[in-house]
A protein has these predicted regions:
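Auxiliary tRNA-acceptor-end handling modules of aminoacyl-tRNA synthetases
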Residues: 23-300, 318, 332-385, 390-406, ...
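Zn2+-dependent metallopeptidase catalytic core
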Residues: 63-64, 301-327
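Bacterial Sec-dependent N-terminal signal peptides
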Residues: 1-23
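Sec-exported extracytoplasmic/periplasmic mature domains
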Residues: 313-324, 423-424, 428, 448, ...
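Conserved catalytic/binding loops enriched for acidic/polar residues
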Residues: 437-831
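The catalytic-center signature of Zn2+-dependent metalloproteases
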Residues: 332-351, 412-468
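Soluble non-cytosolic domains of exported or imported proteins
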Residues: 88, 298, 302-310, 408-413, ...
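Extended catalytic-interface subdomain
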Residues: 370-374, 378, 418, 422-426, ...
């Protein structure tokens, strides 16, 4: 035998010998677990009650076999601001147990990099090129017939969900796991045929440093949550992956396929969806092999329960249109069923200390995009916020017949919300352009569409739509329509072309959420195909609501100070439509066009439309919009004991008394912040370099200057509002000039306009440009003749310019005073 073979074969022989010897030296699994209760399922497990341990026997046929590992929070923190909600899902990880001597390693596979090839060597080359992750190593306690027994307990008691990191990120303090206060939660450790579920009570110990933990935890230095761990059998073969198309409206999985021809993209995308097949593929209408069934959390009370069931059930219409019979159902969760059991798609009712977002998450097979379990989390306080909106609009306590109308408006929103979040768990992304097509999708964020009847009374019967929209039907067709064998791609393209022929708009989050985004149709919480027309209509409704605002908006027996809580969303009723209109300025129409599909390529919005938008926004900076309702002082007293001004109120400089100027300033900053968004202005400046049919940035800013500084107030309040707008306009411009977020030429234009356009009235009445004003030298200037209040105002403006010239960094921080949280209406963004 050669020297090389001797040195190679002997270590291999020794390794195998010691492995066998190691197993022989271990007690048998039966011996080690004597007296323990065996739970049989996908993974069997023993619960050692005396030691508080979970022991997992891993059979030989389970070694090197992939399965899905998911962690979640069945019992959460209860703070919307921090997150960590009840039912929150963690990531989806494909893992397997790998034998390593006398240890088992739980190894996460890397499906982000693959070789979709029949050649094993090609697949192996990619697998070896990129790292895996060993999540845990387990010492073997016992063994027999090639299987091993491991103690899963330390793995289950770790911070799998990243709780400590989330608390630190939220500024709530440094926390660590307290081992002596953590234990297995045996009541929720169960084994099922396709999945095995484990749960643990985990306590975090630390020093709280934020303001949110103390509001939801009895002893803030000790946070006790429950963490759930699911070992899930991966679906069998047969799921037909559907290629993702940016026009389809779906979420997707993505991976790099190194077996792709070099003439094709390296990265592949496939949609996320449930498996759905007809029992009889040849029949025009057929029952499914397995329907998609969602189950309601038994903790949802009436009448919310019925509303959720009705709204979620709307989706069956879309599947019926594809030839399925009862393919989608909503049922009550069976008694005794575990909500975290992967066999149940769940609609869960989540309580928090403050209102917050609802969301639809899913357990997804990362290999294929198949949804294994849909999990909807609905915030229970949403409906209270919707009812509060109705109280502000309808003043139902002066006419109790309107009280039922207010309740129905809140329930109508809940139906729509249930459909929206279930839509996410079917694989659908947001469509924030659907409002341009007459409320064409439940995947949009709807603002209540309130009308005035012939008598001038508010009507809310059409506040929220009922049923799916046209876009929803088309989107479900792409993800779930049966596809003819061998012609799958051809049929999918036909579906897309049919959708395009309807003229429906589709723009998702990245084109709608940023305040500086540009699409004239893609907005959150808006209505109408013409944003400007809708803003004007909404302001009429708002004025009507403010004119009659008073004690009839407040329930009997409530402190009058709580009326301000109802007033806030009425006064700021137009905030989201303002954002929609602002996107017309520097706006660009575009689609998710694919070569050859004939869709609109990017084009700037016509200049006339941009000016129409600017005029509409400038009107919101006038007294007609910012003025206070008559008798406001009597309506908003300071809060009594046990009540307080919280973040749902406007900020105040005047202590506990309502501060009208602070409320006005917040709305002024909201509008100006959108009109002067750095992305918006940079886009305008750049487009004007290459096109003559757009609004030049200097002309735009001059237009704003002229409108804002040429107002002629005719009352004390009007004058105060005008001066406040001018102050905030200058401060916002100085912030932009000092910002690193705008291109240099835009900063130069802003700086030049400020220095040349802000005037100072001298004794002779002549207006001097700032660079000629003596005040620039020593801030003494010529004595001012006129209103001392206005003199102080102009002096303040000049002072800001001096501060900027001395130290631009002083203005780099965003100067905006935020409005009280708006989203979510009824779902954290607080614009």
């Amino acid at each position: 035998m050669s020297r090389f073979l001797r040195f190679t074969v002997f270590p291999l022989f020794a390794l195998c010998f010691f492995h066998v010897q190691a197993q022989r030296s271990l007690p048998s699994i039966a011996e080690y677990t004597k007296g323990m209760v065996l739970h049989e399922g996908y993974f069997d497990f023993f619960y050692d009650e005396s030691g508080g341990r979970i022991l997992l026997p891993v059979r030989p046929d389970q070694m090197d076999v992939e399965f899905l590992y998911v962690h979640s929070l069945p019992a959460g923190l209860g703070s919307n601001d921090i997150g960590l909600d009840r039912g929150q899902l963690g990531g989806n990880r494909v893992v397997k147990f790998v034998r390593a001597g006398n240890k088992l390693l739980l190894e996460e596979q890397n499906y982000s990099y693959r070789a979709e090839s029949e050649n094993p060597a090609e697949r192996q080359s990619v697998e070896e090129a990129f790292a895996k992750s060993v999540l845990w190593g387990f010492s073997c306690l016992a063994g027999e017939e090639g299987g091993f027994l491991i103690d899963l307990t330390p793995f289950l008691l770790r911070d799998a969900h990243g709780v400590a990191a989330r608390l630190k990120e939220a500024g709530e303090g440094d926390y660590r796991i307290s081992e002596e206060r953590s234990a297995i939660y045996p009541a929720r450790c169960k084994a099922f045929p396709r999945n095995t579920e484990f749960e643990a009570t985990v306590t975090f110990e630390g020093e709280p440093s934020g303001k949110f933990v103390p509001t939801v935890v009895p002893s803030p230095e000790l946070i006790t949550l429950r963490m759930h761990h699911s070992f899930i059998q991966l679906p069998d073969e047969g799921f037909r992956m559907r290629p993702y198309d940016p026009r389809s409206g779906y979420f997707y999985i993505a991976f790099k396929d190194y077996a792709s021809p070099f003439t094709e993209p390296l990265e592949k995308h496939y949609i996320i969806c449930h498996r759905l097949e007809k029992k009889n593929p040849l029949a025009e209408r057929s029952e499914p092999v397995k329907p998609i069934v969602y189950y309601l959390d038994p903790g949802v009370p009436e009448p919310m329960r019925s509303a959720l069931k009705e709204g979620a059930s709307w989706w069956n219409e879309a599947f019926e249109a594809l030839g399925f019979i009862d393919a989608f159902r909503v049922e009550d969760l069976p008694e005794g069923a575990d909500p975290m059991d992967v066999r149940y798609n769940l609609i869960q009712w989540v309580h928090r200390s403050t209102r917050g977002w609802s969301y639809g998450g899913s357990v997804v097979d990362p290999r294929t995009g198949e949804i294994i379990k849909g999990h909807v989390s609905l915030g229970s306080l949403r409906i209270r916020q919707d009812f509060l909106l109705a109280e502000g609009l309808l003043a139902p306590y002066g006419d109790t017949s309107r009280l039922e109308e207010a309740r129905e408006m809140a329930l109508a929103r809940l139906r729509q919300l249930a459909a929206h979040e279930v839509g996410h768990t079917l694989g659908l992304a947001h469509n924030f352009a659907a409002s341009c097509d007459g409320r064409a999708s439940v995947m949009d964020y709807p603002h209540p569409y309130v009308l005035l009847d012939e008598e001038g009374k508010m009507r809310t019967d059409k506040a929220y739509d009922s049923g799916l929209g046209a876009w929803d039907m088309r989107a479900i067709a792409y993800g779930y329509a049966p596809l003819p064998e061998g012609k799958e791609e051809e049929r999918l393209q036909e579906i897309l072309q049919e959708t395009l022929s309807t003229g429906l708009h589709y723009i998702s989050d990245e084109g709608a959420r940023p305040s500086g985004s540009m699409h004239p149709c893609a907005h959150l919480w808006d209505n109408g195909s013409d944003a400007v027309v809708e803003l004007e209509r909404l302001l009429v409704l708002r004025e009507k609501a403010l004119q009659k605002f008073g004690l009839d908006n407040l329930p009997p027996g409530r402190p009058v100070a709580e009326l301000e809580r109802i007033f806030v969303p009425v006064y700021a009723m137009h905030r989201y439509q303002v954002e929609a209109v602002a996107k017309w300025i520097g706006g660009v129409e575009y689609t998710y066009a694919v070569k050859g599909d004939g869709q609109q390529l990017p084009r700037p919005l016509p200049l006339a439309d941009q000016k129409r938008a600017a005029d509409a926004l400038l009107k919101t900076l006038g007294l007609s919009v910012l003025g206070m309702p008559h008798g406001w002082l009597e309506l908003f007293p300071p809060p009594p004991p046990a009540y307080q001004r919280d973040r749902e109120f406007f900020r105040a400089w005047s202590g506990d008394l309502f501060d009208p100027q602070a409320a006005q300033l917040a709305l002024i900053d909201h509008t100006l912040g959108l009109m002067l968004d750095p992305q918006r202005l940079s886009r305008m400046q750049q487009l004007a370099v290459y096109r003559d049919d757009v609004w030049d940035i200097e002309d735009y800013l001059k237009y704003l200057f002229k409108s804002i500084f040429s107002s002629k107030p005719d009352s004390k309040e009007d004058r105060e509002v005008a001066m406040l707008v001018q102050k905030r306009f200058v401060v916002h411009l100085l912030h932009l000039a000092a910002s690193d977020e705008v291109n240099p030429q835009l900063a130069a234009v802003i700086e030049d306009l400020l220095l040349r356009r802000v005037s100072y009235r001298t004794q002779s009445g002549k207006h001097w440009a700032p660079e000629d004003n003596p005040a620039f030298a020593d801030f003494r200037g010529v004595p001012f003749v006129g209103d001392p209040n206005f003199r102080a105002h102009e002096t303040w403006i000049l002072r800001q310019i001096f501060l900027y010239l001395k130290d631009p960094a002083f203005f780099r921080q965003d100067p905006s005073v935020p409005l009280p949280p708006g989203s979510p209406i009824g779902c954290g963004d607080s614009r």
